[in-house]
Each structure stands twice: as C-alpha cells, then as structure tokens.
Amino acid sequence: MKLLKAELLLNGGKLEEAQWLLSTIADADELETIIDVVFLYLDMGYPDAAKEWLDRGKSRYTEDEEYMALTADYLASTHQVESAIIYYNKLIDKSPFNPSYWMGLVKCYFVQEQIDKAIEACDFALAADDQYGEAYAYKAHCFFYLNNSDDAIENYQKAIELKAIPPELGYMFMGISYGNKEEWQKADDYYDKVIERFEEDGDKQSILLIDTYTSKAFALSHLERYEEAHELCEKAKEINPNEGLIYLTEGKLYLAEELEDEAAISFEKAIEINPNIEMWYMIASAYSESDYLIEAKEYFEKVYQINPKYEDVTEKLSVLCLMHGEINNFFKYNKECEHPLEEDMILDLLNSPEHREEDERTLKEVWERMKKENKKKTKGKK
C-alpha cells in the first residue's frame, strides 16, 4: 500500500514526501522491499533515490544473486554500461541458463553498437530458452541495424508470434526491411497491417501513423501508384501538418514523377519546419538518388557548411565535384575524407570502359596532379 501511495506522490513530483513515506516501511531492509523500491524510483525517473536504496542492501546482500541482478539492472538503467556488463557476466557465471541475464548483456552490447556480440548473447539466451521472445526481438533489431533484411524479418515474425513486441511495431520494421530489399509490394502489405492495427484500436490520429503513411507512400511511388501516395501524405498532414518528414516524402514522390519544381517547394517546406542538418542531408540524398546531381551538390554543400564532419558529406561532395569537373574542389573535399580516393583508384576509373567520355579529361588531370603530389611527398621523406 505504501509503495502505491509513494508512486502517486512521485507522479505528482513530490519526491521528499515519497522518500519519507518509504522510510517508514517496516521491512525496509528486506531484499524484496529494496528491489521494489529501487525499481519504483528508476521507473519514475529518480536514479539518485534508487541508488540510496540500492546501497542500503550492499553490506548484507552483496553476494546474493537477486541483489547482483538488481545492481546490474540499476547500472544498465543509469547508462553505466561497462560496469553493468561486468555484473551480468558474474550473474551468467552463477546461472548460465538464465536467459534474462543474457538479455541484460544483449542490451548493453546493443547500446554500445557491438552488434555481433549482441547477436551472440541473443543466441545464448535462446539456447537457454528457445521461446524467450525478447531475444528474438533484439536479434531482429540487430539484423535490422546490419541491414540484413532477411534475418531481421524472420526474427521479427518470431517475436510477434511470442508476443514479445507490439505487432504494429514488428510489422513496421518488416515493411522497412522489405523496402530495403526493394520488394515494394511486400513492404506495402506490411504497412497496411500496421494501419489496420491502429484502426482496430480506434487510434487513427496517432503520430506513429505519420511514419507509416510516409513509408507506405514511398513504397507506392516505386509501384508507380502516385495518386495514392500523395493521398497518404495528405492523411499524414491531417495528423500533424508541421511534420517535416511528410514534406520530405512528398518531395521524393515529385522527383519520382519528374516534377522538379513541385519537389523543390516540398523540400523547402521540410527545411522551413526542420532546419536541422539531418533534413538538409536527407534532401541532398533524395536528389542524389534520383540523379539530380546539381541540386544534390547544393544541399550537401549546406550540410558541409553546418558541420564538415557530418556523416559522409565530404565523400559525397568529392565525388560530385569530380563528376562536375571541379578539380580544385575535388581535392579540397577529398583531403578531408576518411577514405579518400587515391591515385590507383583514379587510374582504375580511367581504365574502366564504364566511365563517361566527358569525364576522361577531368580524370586524367586529377591523376596527373595526384602523381605530382605523391612524388613531392616521397621526396620530402628522403
């Protein structure tokens, strides 16, 4: 009863009153009580108060498995990932067939983007319990992260079957995965499943539907069902007319229809709503993917002005400058690339039968300049 009252107080932001109430619990030093209170504070967003209660049991329960699990979960929840990994490994040494400990490890590795280790830990969790749905869900997320669409789809399906992930979320990821495989009809089918779930729940105005409508619209554009795609963008605007993603998608649709002026207007609206670097980059990429290279270069240049180290913007600009015969700008951006084009790569392009005839003069000039610069570097080292 006191835990429930404390939760209500914390919901109202009355931390001190909740702390006093919890301090009056008769069995406050019992491990079960400590566990309940620590998770209450963590769930309500009070990690410092949770730490006080965690420390309360330290001297008495240090080697107790439940207390160690609580400590590991606390460390993971407060982003002390390396320390959490140490505790989860200790717990696994004690109980190697406990899938929840393996899942704790999975989540830590996933946060660290050590995806191969996360997948391996998922496999150990499933070896302990092949019906442990959360392991399938995280394994799916890992494969999705790696752009391994086939394995992601398989694991999302299993996670949905085991009720480890909301179906609408699983279907959304499956739709995106099919889109990554360019299987647009299957992608569209799964977006329909997401929409059906929201409609069944009577939640037709959910902001989550914006992502679904725009993703479905993009899939429909590849199926050349442009009118339906634009209708979906309008439905998304009814939910939130100030969402830049809608206008980004709309711009992509217009590019697919070769309506450059309309695309430009939509992209300008997207920037007006979300003038962040990510939006500039996504618009540049949309132009690039549709072979509007002059516009792509303009938008990538804006990205570079905001942050020269953003994503692979220097790589994009170096290639575009090369294609446009802007040799000085090519060298400027190429020098800043993490993996710059080297002399041998330019020679390969020159020798390739696939290079454009109009590029030959530029490539030869770049190659000759690279040779001279490399000779100077070699002499300087002697």
Label every model-predicted segment:
Residues 28-30, 62, 96, 130, ...:
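Short coil turns that delineate tetratricopeptide repeat
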Residues 11, 43, 77-78, 111, ...:
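Register position in tetratricopeptide repeats
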Residues 23-27, 55-59, 90-93, 123-127, ...:
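Conserved structural position within tetratricopeptide repeats
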Residues 4, 36, 70, 104-107, ...:
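Canonical tetratricopeptide repeat
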Residues 27, 196, 302-311, 315-345, ...:
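TPR/TPR-like (Sel1-like) alpha-helical repeat modules
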Residues 32, 66, 100, 134, ...:
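Start-of-helix register in tetratricopeptide repeats
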